[in-house]
Swiss-Prot record:
PANTHER family: TRNA (GUANINE-N(1)-)-METHYLTRANSFERASE. It comes from Chloroherpeton thalassium (strain ATCC 35110 / GB-78). It catalyses: guanosine(37) in tRNA + S-adenosyl-L-methionine = N(1)-methylguanosine(37) in tRNA + S-adenosyl-L-homocysteine + H(+). Keywords: Cytoplasm, Methyltransferase, S-adenosyl-L-methionine, Transferase, tRNA processing. GO terms for molecular function: tRNA (guanine(37)-N1)-methyltransferase activity. Belongs to the RNA methyltransferase TrmD family. Pfam families: tRNA_m1G_MT (PF01746). This is tRNA (guanine-N(1)-)-methyltransferase. Its EC number is 2.1.1.228. S-adenosyl-L-methionine binds at residues 112, 132-137.
Length: 228
C-alpha cells in the first residue's frame, strides 16, 4: 500500500512514522508513506496556502491552487483508490472502514488546517470525507495518523501475532473481553478462576460472555447488529 499525505505541517509526522507499528509496516515494505509539504505548492514569495474567507468572518481558509497543484501532480504518476479529507462533518470512521481501506493500493490523505478548506476542493478532488467523532481538532494530521495506524495493523505481516487482531474490539461487531496476566492475585484482586483452569472450551465461553456483557454495558448500540 502507498499513502501520500498532504499537510502544511510535514514535520508533524517525523516521530510517529519512525516509531512503533508504522515503522514496522514501512520496514517490512507493506506500507509506503510519502509526506508532501503543501507550502511547496504555495503562492508567491511567501508560499501562501491560505486566505481570508469571502463574505468575512473569523479564521483562514485553505486555498484551492496549492491543493489542486499537489494532487494533480500525484495523480499524473498513478491512480488512487481514494482522496480522503478529514473533517468533523465526514462519515464516522470505524473498524469496518479500516478493514475496507486495508485492501486499497494507493491513497491520498489531505490534512486540513486553519478554519476550513475551500469548498471547491471538497466538491472536485475529495472522494471520501472521514470524521473521528463529534469534536474539532486543529488540523487533519492527528486523524491521518490514527487512520494510518488502524489500517496498517491490518496489512499482512505487520503484526507479530495476527490472530490477536481477529479478537480486537469491533472486529466481530462487539467489544473485546477483559484480559489478565501475571500475577494471578494482586492486593486481593484475583484473576477469574476459569482463566487459570486450562479448559480452553470454558475459557472461550467465558470470553464470549464477558465480551457480550461488556458491550451491553458500554456500547449497547452495537448489539442490535449481532445475532446472539
Amino acid at each position: 500500500m502507498r499513502v501520500d499525505i498532504i499537510s502544511v505541517l510535514p514535520d508533524f509526522f517525523d516521530s510517529p512514522l519512525a516509531n512503533g507499528l508504522l515503522r514496522i509496516a514501512r520496514e517490512k515494505q507493506r506500507l509506503q508513506l510519502h509526506v508532501h509539504s503543501l507550502r511547496e505548492y504555495g503562492l508567491g514569495k511567501y508560499k501562501q496556502v491560505d486566505d481570508t474567507p469571502f463574505g468575512g468572518g473569523a479564521g483562514m481558509v485553505l486555498r484551492v491552487e496549492p491543493v489542486f497543484a499537489c494532487i494533480e501532480k500525484l495523480k499524473a504518476d498513478r491512480d488512487y483508490d481514494e482522496v480522503i479529507f478529514f473533517t468533523p462533518d465526514g462519515k464516522q470512521f470505524n473498524q469496518s472502514e479500516a478493514n475496507r481501506h486495508a485492501l486499497d493500493r494507493n491513497l491520498i490523505l489531505l490534512c486540513g488546517h486553519y478554519k476550513a478548506i475551500d469548498e471547491r476542493i471538497r466538491e472536485t478532488l475529495i472522494t471520501k470525507e472521514i470524521s473521528l467523532g463529534d469534536f474539532v481538532l486543529s488540523g487533519g494530521e492527528l486523524p491521518a495518523l490514527i487512520f494510518l495506524d488502524s489500517v496498517a495493523r491490518l496489512l499482512p505481516g505487520v503484526l507479530h501475532d495476527e490472530e490477536s487482531m481477529l479478537t480486537d474490539s469491533f472486529q466481530d461487531g462487539k467489544l473485546d473481553c477483559a484480559h489478565y496476566t501475571r500475577p494471578s492475585e494482586f492486593r486481593g484482586m484475583k484473576v477469574p478462576d476459569v482463566l487459570l483452569s486450562g479448559n480452553h472450551k470454558k475459557i472461550e465461553e467465558w470470553r464470549l460472555e464477558n465480551a457480550i456483557e461488556r458491550t451491553r454495558q458500554r456500547r449497547p448500540d452495537l448489539l442490535k447488529d449481532i445475532n446472539l
